Amino acid sequence: MSSDPTSSVPATSPDPGSVPGSVSGSVPGSVPGSVPERLLALLDRLGAVLAERGDAIALLGLGSVGRDLHRLDEHSDADFFVVVDDGAETAYVRDIDWLEATAPVAWSFDNSPHGRKVLFEDGLFAEYAVLSLTQLGSAGYPPARIIWQRADAPDGLDEPSVPLPGTPLLEEQVGEAVTNLYVGLHRDLRGERLTATRFIQGYAVDRLITILGLLGLGEGGQQDLFVIDRGVERRFPPDVLPLADIVVGYDGNARAALALLEVLERHVTVEPRLAREIRALAARAGT
């Protein structure tokens, strides 16, 4: 999730019928009744529900319903934090009456000790966590958007206390990429093709994306600070990141490894001995 500080919407405590920070209807180009409009309206209603409960402190929107509202589209869902008084979080996770008061729920399940994934009857999807103030202070999350907060809520809930991931070292990422290829090809030759596919067409590709970003070859920054592959098709043109050549499927590990190695060699220095080993392994795996 990337951040846009200018779109943060500060809020103060409402009376139960109003929710400051509401942005429904403000997404440029959105259509009434569209998924973006419905998601924002859902969160506005949720803020109003929480405002009537004495133990809720804030509702924080994340990702495309947070500070990156420009990313909202028909395929978006709602990621959010509900911040509550210390000791109240267990009841919020166990009993979703507050969520059902917002919109009818078709299905949900506990996906962590702190939250759930939920499908609403109207087809909207959401993932959320319920955190106490103490828990929020140790949580890693991107800068958020305050949809609603109580009058006595501490300042700065939308900014994480835990430092965001730092900038990785280029040399380290290159080393990880080529060793992912090396290990993956050995596993392919052993017959462990699924794990080989993950090493070559998953982990090594992630490292390549990081490398290209460090070299400034992308348009804009990383979309999601915690998920490297989000939005890469918009960020890198095919001549820079040839995904069709390096993500070719279960039967194409040798071909993908060679293609990825060639991309690396165009942009960074690869240890010659390791490059030779990778090519030799790919030749064996491709036969």
Named regions from a protein language model:
Residues 2, 98-195, 199, 203:
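Conserved NTP/Mg2+-binding pocket subregion across the NTase superfamily
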Residues 4-20:
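Long, compositionally biased low-complexity repeat segments characteristic
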Residues 4-5, 162-287:
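Conserved nucleotidyltransferase catalytic core and NTase-mimicking acidic/glycine-rich helix/loop elements
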Residues 16-32:
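Long, intrinsically disordered low-complexity tandem-repeat segments
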Residues 33-54, 62-75, 81-129:
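Metal-dependent nucleotidyltransferase catalytic core
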Residues 71-74, 140-141, 223-225:
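Short aromatic-enriched loop/helix-cap "lid" or pocket-rim segments at secondary-structure transitions
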Residues 96, 143-145, 229, 233:
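Generic secondary-structure boundary/loop-capping signal
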